[in-house]
Amino acid sequence: DFLDNYGAELNFEAFEDGISICLKSLSEYFDRLFPLLTLLIEEPNLFEKEFTYCQKEALNNVIKAKENSFNITFNNIKKILYKEHPYSFNCNGDEESINLIKYDDILKEYQSFRKRKKYLLTNNSKCKFSKLKDIEACVFDKKEGEIQPNLIIKNKNNYIEHYSNSKQIIIFIGSQTCPHNSKDSISLKILESYLSYGMSSLLFKVFREKNGLTYDSGVFYPVRKFNAPFLIYLSVSEKNASFTFSLLLSIWNDLLSKELTNNELSLAKLKLKRSRLHNYRSLEEITFRKVRLLGLGMDPFYDVHVENHINKIKSEDILNISKKYLTYPCISLSGRKQICKDLKEIWRNKY
């Protein structure tokens, strides 16, 4: 109610590598609202009654997610890609872990949170950073060295399946790659653009335009502090599953053996640049991106220089990066048992 009276918004997001809190308001009201961040960061403010409600809500969200075969297939491939690494777990948790959390654990978490590195960005020059303890306000010169990926060269357990009664087959194929602050990540972003950006993308042309096979297709390549996953996903009907799967493996093989043509490379670069402009248009998006970069130990003005790096990358570079990270993929399937067994046979013959 306090925020609504000033027409302000407070947004919170938790992800694999951190937590983001965003406060938006008119400049004239910011001084009155800014102390809320102090309360959120420094003082336990969740009453036990509210904790119980939040715990039930978290459980409901997890239970709903378990009903979605796409989520199950996605979570399964993370389990075999990362094993006991934090990236193998769902940010929303699971039923067992949520039920084990007690109110005292939340109070202890506040103490842990106060010790973590925090970064604050605002466009309000009158903001007094000293109100917040342990906030690094002037961090633009703080950069970590490039994190080298600690890759699993070949995962012996590269296949996982989930049986469902659905007539839809869901497929995820992918590998661990590099952290976001690696120079290799730009080549992988170009590859993502080539595969999945728009109606000119390879996945759309092969699976939808030419063959009319898939309900959905795309690439998942997120920003991560450590090894990010590079995943291609598809959903397809049972009758088209084998043909679609063979096409997918053929595309994956081409990524490891063929260079992009000059036209393909130019178009992929152009789409990537335009995507970046589209994603970082609003003040909120730009600020969140800079805070995210700081949290990853990167230059908050990294994006200013990215276009020059994109322009320098050649098809040969992308092929070499593909060979470096995508040679030993893992696969996750969801569908009826017999269809999964048929696809598993195709997979075992290839990998």
At which residue positions do the language-model features occur?
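His/Glu-based metal-binding/catalytic segments typifying zinc-dependent metallopeptidases
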Residues: 145-204, 309
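Charge-rich, well-structured scaffold segments of protease-associated domains
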Residues: 1-146, 171, 177-179, 209-351
